């Protein structure tokens, strides 16, 4: 979904309106926030102020504010937004859903889909699917989290027991009264489980219109499960939605590995964000949910949640000196520099041939890419770190919208890793 805002330049120096318009057109949300915070008072185009506030609220975890500014935009500036109105309404429906107002989320998308039909157009299948999903969720009870006043600690497990090569990180959970192992995955924007897992916990699969989810490739959902309770230590979630998917690939070896890993249930970042802050204490192998927030550092915020529901962390690349986007993925077995990074810095790899192959398996299939091993330095939260051997992907069909994927080995090389969702910042602690 694109937000279209035309810009034109009449001189050498671009106005703040033009720069903000370009940030929106390029989906550069961190740049948009920086521009607006430093120079937003000088905007001349009336609708750019509420539109900027809408996107900043949307991607920096302020759903209440996003709805407020979204309403203002739809009431006053529909003509100016034109073809971008559906995107605004879709994002607002997601905000309503985050707040547990599934009925409002469904109603908003219903009005959008009806407008398409009345205009003789075909409604967007994603909008239709989520209208159906939110409608079904509105009949299943409100999502909530019950937590004690003290810190909560949940043991972390890895498949290998080796911090340098953990392969997968899991937690033991109690779902609908059954003790089960679940992958704890910050790179998953939604919770998912297999049909087999749903049968194991005796959950009813609700039939919904399918959505496509991106893993190794796109895969269709096969319905929805709403679990009555999900317990992590002393935390209790109520009415938790999980999408049902087929984890199998067309590769027998990959399927065998996924079965060995017990890859059947994924707790995604939609269940992490309501906690406000989480700390991965890798020395003690504990997931800690603190009773009070860590004081906000001066560099906050340094990440946002993208339209694809990924955490985009701002790093300074040691090779180029530029800011780059990295996703933080506790479901990833390794760290990579993506093909997008390679294309931006191709001149740095002149004369080097991609001789290594990287094979990864996950939801939707198997992906094999050619890579070049490099040493890489980056700066996060004012501290510099070095990866001595990291693959740079020289070709890819996935068209990633980020430059780096930070996986488990990089994260677990440190004592702790903190993610604060209230003020949207991350950092290592050593």
Per-segment meaning from a language model:
Residues 11-430:
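Pepsin/retropepsin-fold aspartyl endopeptidases
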Residues 1-6:
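Bacterial N-terminal signal peptides
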């Amino acid at each position: 979904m694109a937000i279209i805002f035309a810009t034109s330049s009449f001189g050498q120096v671009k106005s703040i309106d033009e720069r903000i318009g370009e940030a929106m057109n390029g989906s550069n949300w961190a740049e948009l926030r920086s521009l607006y915070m430093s120079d937003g008072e000088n905007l001349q185009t009336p609708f750019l102020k509420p539109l900027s506030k809408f996107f900043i609220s949307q991607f920096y975890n302020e759903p209440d504010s996003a709805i407020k500014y979204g309403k203002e935009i739809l009431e006053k500036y529909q003509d100016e937004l034109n073809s971008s109105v559906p995107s605004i309404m879709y994002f607002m429906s997601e905000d309503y859903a985050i707040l547990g107002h599934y009925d409002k989320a469904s109603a908003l998308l219903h009005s959008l889909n009806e407008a398409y039909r009345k205009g003789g157009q075909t409604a967007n299948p994603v909008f239709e699917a989520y209208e159906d999903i939110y409608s079904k969720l509105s009949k299943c009870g409100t999502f909530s989290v019950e937590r004690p006043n003290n810190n909560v600690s949940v043991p972390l497990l890895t498949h290998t027991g080796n911090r340098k090569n953990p392969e997968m990180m899991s937690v033991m959970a109690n779902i609908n009264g059954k003790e089960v192992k679940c992958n704890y995955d910050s790179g998953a924007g939604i919770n998912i489980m297999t049909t087999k897992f749903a049968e194991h916990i005796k959950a009813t699969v609700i039939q919904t219109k399918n959505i496509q989810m991106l893993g190794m490739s796109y895969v269709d959902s096969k319905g929805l499960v709403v679990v009555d309770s999900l317990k992590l230590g002393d935390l209790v979630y109520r009415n938790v939605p999980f999408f049902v998917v087929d984890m199998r690939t067309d590769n027998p070896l990959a399927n065998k590995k996924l079965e060995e890993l017990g890859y059947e249930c994924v707790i995604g970042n939609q269940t992490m964000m309501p906690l406000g802050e989480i700390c991965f204490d890798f020395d003690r192998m504990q997931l800690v949910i603190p009773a009070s927030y860590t004081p906000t550092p001066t560099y906050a915020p340094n990440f946002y949640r993208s339209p694809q529901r990924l955490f985009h962390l701002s790093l300074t690349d040691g090779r180029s000196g530029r800011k780059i986007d990295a996703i933080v993925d506790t479901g990833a077995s390794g760290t990579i520099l993506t093909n997008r990074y390679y294309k931006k810095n191709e001149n740095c790899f002149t004369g080097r041939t991609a001789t290594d192959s990287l094979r990864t398996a996950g939801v939707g299939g198997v992906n094999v890419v050619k890579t070049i091993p490099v040493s890489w330095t980056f700066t996060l939260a004012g501290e510099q770190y070095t990866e001595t051997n990291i693959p740079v992907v020289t070709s890819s069909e996935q068209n990633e919208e980020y430059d780096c994927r930070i996986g488990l080995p990089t994260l677990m090389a440190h004592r702790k890793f903190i993610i604060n969702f209230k003020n949207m910042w991350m950092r290592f602690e050593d």
